[in-house]
A protein has these predicted regions:
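A C-terminal cap/extension of S-adenosyl-L-methionine-dependent methyltransferases
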Residues: 3-6, 234-236, 269-324
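Conserved class I S-adenosyl-L-methionine
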Residues: 43-127, 130, 134, 218-240
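Conserved SAM/SAH-binding beta-strand->alpha-helix loop
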Residues: 148-150
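A short glycine-rich, Lys/Arg-flanked "PGG" loop and its adjoining helix->strand segment in the class I
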Residues: 201-213
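Acceptor-substrate binding/catalytic loop of class I
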Residues: 235-253
Length: 324
């Protein structure tokens, strides 16, 4: 890990400074966090996990088992990382199931933010690092966090292959292991939507703490009034959802929650007819999905001049200025 990250890592339990002791980071209260393959693992074992990756990582660390990628450096040369081949539909959306294990390139999306100019960027729930890499290639200095040690090693491998300068930490979004006000920008995509609303709000509070005053926060969330979202809710009987199910929010509820946690917030359309649709990936997807993506992009662009369309977008962005 680089010197900036080391200086700004704190105990996720009590936010105290950490000391290096052999292969651990230790705070004054003797909370210990292993460093595996130069990746800090900052998870809390006494907290109820909100994703099976937390349990899996804690078990691997307890058994002193590192993912194979930590030992062999991941995929060789230009080969697509095996973890990414397997995980892509779970990180990018249902449209990607037909190309699972068939990727010919990494689906790196367009980050809808201005150039980074070296700003410190936090990618919350990075998994294999597609948005972390996108941020690095746009001039940010990004740190990605995820509860999966396997995902983080894959992310590090992808970064190396893409020539992107990135850093990664294994952490729980509800207990961020960073000093107050150390990031200029925070970002999250297809992550908080799968948290209970209580856990999502806890995560937003931690993001607000970690981002500088007047820093920017851009987070994707699902809109319960989108056509595809309504269909998915009907399929499950309009239940609230459990475990890592998607929780659907109304635009009004989102604006209220984000304004309370950050301050000034605006809502814009991300995509229509589903979650996670990315025009940059149209060459990777089957022909039958291309009309969906083109239609989504048309409506997204139209929503700039017709803001009411945001109310029926399936996926929205909340862009906030941190005043907390």
């Amino acid at each position: 890990m680089n010197s900036w990250l080391r200086e700004n890592l704190v105990c996720p339990r009590d936010k105290k400074k950490l000391q290096d002791k052999e292969n651990y980071l230790v705070c004054s209260e003797n909370h210990r966090y292993p460093v595996v393959g130069d990746v800090p693992v900052m998870l809390l074992d006494e907290i109820e996990p909100n994703h099976h990756y937390i349990t899996e990582t804690l078990e691997d660390v307890a058994d002193n088992q590192s993912p194979a990628a930590a030992k062999n450096g991941g995929a060789a040369g230009g080969a697509i990382d095996e973890f990414v081949q397997d995980e892509v539909p779970h990180t990018c959306g249902n449209l990607y199931f037909p190309i699972r294990y068939k990727l010919t390139r990494y689906p790196i999306p367009e980050l809808r933010l201005p150039g980074g100019d070296g700003k410190r960027f936090l990618d919350v729930g990075c998994n294999w690092g597609r948005w972390t890499v996108a941020a690095a290639l746009k001039g940010y200095q990004p740190v990605g966090i995820d509860p999966s040690l396997k995902a983080v090693f894959a992310a590090r491998n992808v970064s190396r292959q893409m020539g992107a300068a990135t850093e990664f930490v294994v952490a729980d979004t509800r207990y961020l292991p960073f000093a107050d006000s150390c990031f200029d920008v925070a970002f999250s995509y297809l992550v908080l939507q799968s948290f209970s609303k209580e856990n999502a709000k806890i995560s937003l509070q931690e993001i607000a703490r970690s981002v500088k005053a007047d820093g920017k926060i851009l987070i994707q969330m699902p809109n319960k009034f989108g056509a595809r979202s309504f269909y998915q809710q009907a399929r499950r009987g309009f239940s609230k959802g459990e475990d890592f199910d998607i929780r659907y929010w109304s635009p009004t509820e989102l604006m209220k929650t984000f304004t309370e946690n950050f301050g000034e917030t605006k809502i814009t359309a991300d995509c229509f007819f589903g979650l996670g649709l990315q025009k940059n990936d149209i060459d990777l997807l089957p022909a039958r999905f291309k009309t969906v993506i083109h239609s989504s992009e048309f409506l997204r662009r139209a929503s700039v001049k017709m803001p009411w369309l945001v109310n029926v977008a399936d996926s929205v962005y909340l862009e906030s200025i941190n005043r907390k």
